[in-house]
Amino acid sequence: MENEPDHENVEQSLCAKTSEEELNKSFNLEASLSKFSYIDMDKELEFKNDLIDDKEFDIPQVDTPPTLESILNETDDEDESFILEDPTLLNIDTIDSHSYDTSSVASSDSGDRTNLKRKKKLPDSFSLHGSVMRHSLLKGISAQIVSAADKVDAGLPTAIAVSSLIAVGTSHGLALIFGKDQNQALRLCLGSTSVGGQYGAISALSINNDCSRLLCGFAKGQITMWDLASGKLLRSITDAHPPGTAILHIKFTDDPTLAICNDSGGSVFELTFKRVMGVRTCESRCLFSGSKGEVCCIEPLHSKPELKDHPITQFSLLAMASLTKILVIGLKPSLKVWMTFPYGRMDPSSVPLLAWHFVAVQNYVNPMLAFCRGDVVHFLLVKRDESGAIHVTKQKHLHLYYDLINFTWINSRTVVLLDSVEKLHVIDRQTQEELETVEISEVQLVYNSSHFKSLATGGNVSQALALVGEKACYQSISSYGGQIFYLGTKSVYVMMLRSWRERVDHLLKQDCLTEALALAWSFHEGKAKAVVGLSGDASKRKAIVADRMVEILFHYADRALKKCPDQGKIQVMEQHFQDMVPVIVDYCLLLQRKDLLFSQMYDKLSENSVAKGVFLECLEPYILSDKLVGITPQVMKDLIVHFQDKKLMENVEALIVHMDITSLDIQQVVLMCWENRLYDAMIYVYNRGMNEFISPMEKLFRVIAPPLNAGKTLTDEQVVMGNKLLVYISCCLAGRAYPLGDIPEDLVPLVKNQVFEFLIRLHSAEASPEEEIYPYIRTLLHFDTREFLNVLALTFEDFKNDKQAVEYQQRIVDILLKVMVENSDFTPSQVGCLFTFLARQLAKPDNTLFVNRTLFDQVLEFLCSPDDDSRHSERQQVLLELLQAGGIVQFEESRLIRMAEKAEFYQICEFMYEREHQYDKIIDCYLRDPLREEEVFNYIHNILSIPGHSAEEKQSVWQKAMDHIEELVSLKPCKAAELVATHFSGHIETVIKKLQNQVLLFKFLRSLLDPREGIHVNQELLQISPCITEQFIELLCQFNPTQVIETLQVLECYRLEETIQITQKYQLHEVTAYLLEKKGDIHGAFLIMLERLQSKLQEVTHQGENTKEDPSLKDVEDTMVETIALCQRNSHNLNQQQREALWFPLLEAMMAPQKLSSSAIPHLHSEALKSLTMQVLNSMAAFIALPSILQRILQDPVYGKGKLGEIQGLILGMLDTFNYEQTLLETTTSLLNQDLHWSLCNLRASVTRGLNPKQDYCSICLQQYKRRQEMADEIIVFSCGHLYHSFCLQNKECTVEFEGQTRWTCYKCSSSNKVGKLSENSSEIKKGRITPSQVKMSPSYHQSKGDPTAKKGTSEPVLDPQQIQAFDQLCRLYRGSSRLALLTELSQNRSSESYRPFSGSQSAPAFNSIFQNENFQLQLIPPPVTED
């Protein structure tokens, strides 16, 4: 039995009173649940199923009575199962093809039968699960079917039913009954070909539970009942259902007197068999009428005899599948509908499928219904509550990537699915994992298409049912007792689950030993799927599988040695064994068979030296992870020798520290470790092998002490040794084993005492006369003072209640002081580390150490020595750490401050001042410290802004900052400005008075006022007076005059008049002009600029011949450009007279130098000035009418008397510009006309093109429009390609009223994927913006070719709303600002007067022209390419 989650939250009680709408709503809610939640819960339940009975088809056991357990475990047949044989080929080519359509889709392409072969399984599922199904041909039955067709004209097989016997129906009305014994003999041949000629082919078969009766349904509608014991015909039923329809299904229920049949009319009938006074009768009752929806699949719930008392069986449930929904009804005690479940949209050609099976959910056995159509399988659990009501719970979805034509339960965990291309898929139901895929095209499966089309009665069935029948094979597949039988046109095949041994052996036969071991291990761990044949509890099952795995491992080892390549490079052999040997090691260790691994397997693999080496290397990861202990001495010795021979000494060291080396030669291992510098391994061997902890220290000290005492630099190797020594000492003093693990508890005190005694030795064992006292502590202090003291500090943490340890602690401290204080070999940093260590120890509340205070005074004098400037920062940092560690209590604070100030230890001063809350003095510390002086700003800001300081403290800091403001500004002006803006905003004028240096004041004001400096200051909150801003502007004029204009553009809060006076004072004429323009005095600003221009021109005029890059000429050009820009900025706001007052003086100023004689002006400057004058003319042409310009030039006294030679170039340039603009306008107009012509041609081609529908059937009713016979219905084709009957479209309410006319909208486009789009389209249509694209036309058979009205209707082409919509889209596509502006320009009515160039009209200059529009953009692009 199996456990599954019972989803109470989606459970729905379904009863007869429940309306179909409520049922649909409840199941739609259930369908929204994610399938993944079910998968996850099933995976959890899978691991709880431990017990599997070998009589089961892999149904896990639960805590229920044995009788309930056996219900799901026993096979249905009582007879001994027949022996299956391997598939063989039959010589059946002589059979004539029959008129009935019973051949499979795949059989038509099968070709020569001798080429049929079984399809290979998918590699992934095969390697993971092996071959799950056994696929065999029933030779005896297949041969007799072929023989019957040949000798007695039985016809081709059409249906099969299996119980204790196998019944096969034929196309000529015979029912062949075969035994399920080894011989597969023909027991009975029921019926005759004459009756078959009258009734037609057998279309359905059913055998009752005790295998005593057989029901046969025929293609022409008759039903017969046979006694399988005697072969007698008991009943011939001809009036059970309406005539003219074939029997599609006939099913016995658990009640032998009750059967259900389903005909090709879609109706379902209940058949009740009675025997009154020796007369056998049959009463028929219609359960479901085909007029309400055609049922094409029925499945009654069958229960085994052991489940006869199940509360569900008394209802005699029947599941029916129509083309639109699923129904579950109860036949007893009275007819009642328990559930309806609609399908939803799906492929109309897919086959509805139903299948029942009893499963165990939460220790209760209940029936589960699987139903599917297409590629989704739904599972419904049916159960009864205490009140007697039936509840149906949606369990899960099974989403597939193929369409199903058959669904079969093989047991409660495993299902077998057949898809539309005749591939079998074995699925684990709980995890939805596909275990195997098998192709069965060689079966040549029989299909029931002819019966669904009811060809024997004239084909009077609906097209929908006929379409489903194309793939129907209900009667060709039958399951019984965990076996599935497949009926082919000339054979019968059977499939069943392989036992676990067969699956493993199947892989072994295919030489897949690795996969076989992996599969066997999954059986061992209980993670395999579809397991058959394992019995007993978990330990018994594991033992059985383990024995089989050991056999495979021996075979695997022999194969590894035999398959070894005899020749070739050694790398080839190594690769071979690296692929094979790790598998043996892995599975031996997984099975916890070290005895097998290190005896038989090792001995076997040792025959080959390469295999032996690979074997030893495979042990390494298990040893390093401590998963392999207890290695035999021989293997351990071989392992070390192997790695040593391969020069892998680091690996040897890593292995030794994880091994039990007591069985090895200790001295030999130590010698090897020392020679190869394996210090960790050496220490481990001493500790574990000899319980010796001091000898490793002595060996390491002998190496690192001499160079340290000599003052030499240690090598990298010696540094590594020193670090290992420190860690080793730390571990010993902490009770930890080195390099891993713990020292045995009984040895911890002894080891600590030994290590302390060793460290405090006065002299070493082999001391020389020159050796200083306490050599070991001295060596460690020289090696790494800080780390050695850290080791001691960690050790002292444990010295709380141990009196002897406390004595050791004091003794070591005294030795440290004696060694370091009385010796000058140590640096200040090292001495400081010692006293910091001591200060921390003395500061502890439970301190027991005693240190003379005068030693701290000596250290203070040493660190603050003013005579020694070396290592200043180091000395200061050491003293600071000492104070922070609690050493301050050892000093007199006033003396400490004096010495710190004298030594310029400003961080020490800050530390002391902060303790006394003298924050203002800390500012001096920052300002005097060159390394930290810029941090003073953040410090002042934090004191003044962060809460926690008193008002007096803040005031003292504020005043101190104010006193040093000039120093702060000189240090960092922008930071000082930000500080002032934040904390001194009300005292800015005081700050300015304190800044006597004008350069500093300028930098400060620029940082404060110029937003471009990047400081984050809110100018509104500052409330700076205009006087300060003007003071800054004046300083700016002095120190950086070139930046005045740019600064004025971003500055605020200054007075124009006063600022103008400042700029005039410093003769900054451009700035003055800018301010006058800002003031509104345009003429005044212009006069200043004009005066500057004239002065520049005068300089050029009086200069001699110069180079082309004359700076004076460049000044003229720059000044002229600025003057032009001034005129252009302000001309829009001036009248014509005021514009002329600006532009004409500028023009005269530029032309004045040209009036002089040519000898007065260098030729080079003459050409340059003419070019600049032309630039002025081009600029003023946008604001001054061209006739006015010419008139002003001609009125000049110089040119008015006929001297036009000097200005000939200017006039010709103006005319060239006019010609260019006129040509540009004509070209643009031509391009637009061509573009418009092309667009209209393209539009005309688009709207007159015919529509090509995507399909030839209505997208709503799915019927071809040519076959519809009801009425002369119109066909509507949309531009999207969808086609509809107008009647279908009208039923879907896809019409919109628009200006009194009915307009259509495409149903699929507006509602299928675009929710709410139809309503939006309706509103758009009513507003006249869009129109649905459609073409109405009548079918050809509804209209006469010579209909004059049709010709008249097409004589006048008129744009319909669809074409208007297309035209609007085209206009929007090619719409642009420049083209619209140009079209507007061209569309204006022009009189001959206004259109004449150089007309004398002054009142309407070309200000409205597109050429005067600054936003006008001409976009010239080729037309887009379209497909024809």
Swiss-Prot record:
Do you know which Gene3D superfamilies this protein is assigned to? YVTN repeat-like/Quinoprotein amine dehydrogenase (2.130.10.10), Zinc/RING finger domain, C3HC4 (zinc finger) (3.30.40.10)
Does Metal-binding count among this protein's keywords? yes
Where are the coiled-coil regions?
A: none
Which molecular-function annotations from GO does this UniProt entry contain?
A: zinc ion binding
Which residues does the record list as Phosphoserine (modified residue)? S26, S32, S127
**Which residue stretches does the UniProt record annotate as biased composition, category Basic and acidic residues?**
1344-1354
Annotated region Disordered: the residues are: 1330-1356
Q: Which domain of life is it from?
A: Eukaryota
Query: Which PROSITE patterns has this protein been placed in?
Result: WD_REPEATS_2, WD_REPEATS_REGION, ZF_RING_2
Q: Where is the composition biased (Polar residues)?
A: 1331-1343
- Which InterPro entries does its entry note? Quino_amine_DH_bsu, Vps41/Vps8, Vps8_central_dom, WD40/YVTN_repeat-like_dom_sf, WD40_repeat_dom_sf, WD40_rpt, Znf_RING, Znf_RING/FYVE/PHD
Single GO cellular component annotation?
early endosome
Protein keywords = Endosome, Metal-binding, Phosphoprotein, Protein transport, Transport, WD repeat, Zinc, Zinc-finger
The UniProt entry annotates WD repeats at 195-236
Subcellular location per UniProt equals: Early endosome
Per UniProt, the RING-type Zn-finger stretches lie at: 1258-1310
Q: Name one GO biological process term.
A: protein targeting to vacuole
The protein's role, per its UniProt record: Plays a role in vesicle-mediated protein trafficking of the endocytic membrane transport pathway. Believed to act as a component of the putative CORVET endosomal tethering complexes which is proposed to be involved in the Rab5-to-Rab7 endosome conversion probably implicating MON1A/B, and via binding SNAREs and SNARE complexes to mediate tethering and docking events during SNARE-mediated membrane fusion. The CORVET complex is proposed to function as a Rab5 effector to mediate early endosome fusion probably in specific endosome subpopulations.
Could you describe the subunit structure of this protein?
Interacts with RAB5C. Interacts with TGFBRAP1. Component of the putative class C core vacuole/endosome tethering (CORVET) complex; the core of which composed of the class C Vps proteins VPS11, VPS16, VPS18 and VPS33A, is associated with VPS8 and TGFBRAP1.
Family to which this protein belongs: Belongs to the VPS8 family.
Q: Write the protein's name.
A: Vacuolar protein sorting-associated protein 8 homolog
Q: Which organism is it from?
A: Homo sapiens
